[in-house]
Regions:
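Short aromatic-glycine-(Arg/Gly/Cys) micro-motifs in beta-strand/loop hairpins
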Residues: 26-48, 95-115
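Short N-terminal "domain-start" leader segments
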Residues: 2-32, 72-102
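Short intrinsically disordered terminal tails
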Residues: 1, 143-148
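Mixed-charge, glycine-accented linear interaction segment located at domain edges/termini
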Residues: 118-144
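Boundary-flanking segments of nucleic-acid-binding domains in nuclear regulatory proteins
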Residues: 86-88, 135, 146
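Low-complexity, intrinsically disordered short peptide segments enriched in small/polar/basic residues
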Residues: 14-15, 59, 129, 145
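Short, structured interface segments
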Residues: 55-77
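A short, exposed loop/beta-hairpin motif centered on an aromatic-Gly-Thr core
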Residues: 40-61, 110-127
């Protein structure tokens, strides 16, 4: 699997749909997807890879596949966009949350849906993002992409 295309991800009914390049056949890119669930480990499709079992030659097509499957089979239907405050930095996915005036985050590296976030609370979203960016900037990156 190539890196997860977090910068292309979309949020849909309590899931984050994350496309990635599955393969290339005759110069044609084939996309698949992985999911994160707002319910985390309680969600049936948390960290699932392409539960629909279909692929597409476009990112929009793979979103259609994922959304159709989630609409038919998901156990999570959330009107709240749990993934609203998501950012990519150096191809890492950062999701910032607020609860009772405190901020915390989830951090996923470019090739894995294992949360590597430090257990730390912040006074503001900006403090949280600055701390994460400073930590990531300490290490050289083979690929640079900053959208924080």
């Amino acid at each position: 699997m190539n890196r997860l295309l977090y910068e292309k991800s979309i949020s849909d009914n309590g899931h984050l749909i994350i496309p990635f390049v599955f393969s290339t056949v005759n110069s044609q890119t084939i996309y698949s997807y992985k999911l994160l669930s707002a319910l985390v480990h309680k969600g049936t499709f948390h960290k699932a890879e392409n539960p629909a079992g279909f692929y597409s030659n476009s990112i929009e097509g793979i979103f259609d596949v994922a959304q159709e499957h989630l609409n038919a089979h998901s156990d999570v239907f959330s009107p709240v966009d749990y993934f609203k405050c998501r950012y990519t930095y150096r191809y890492n996915l950062i999701i910032v949350y607020e609860e009772s005036g405190k901020y915390f985050y989830d951090h996923y590296k470019s090739d894995s849906l294992n949360n590597v976030a430090a257990p730390k609370l912040f006074q503001s979203k900006d403090d949280c993002l600055r701390w994460i960016k400073a930590g990531l900037d300490r290490y050289p990156a083979s690929e640079e992409a900053a959208t924080i």
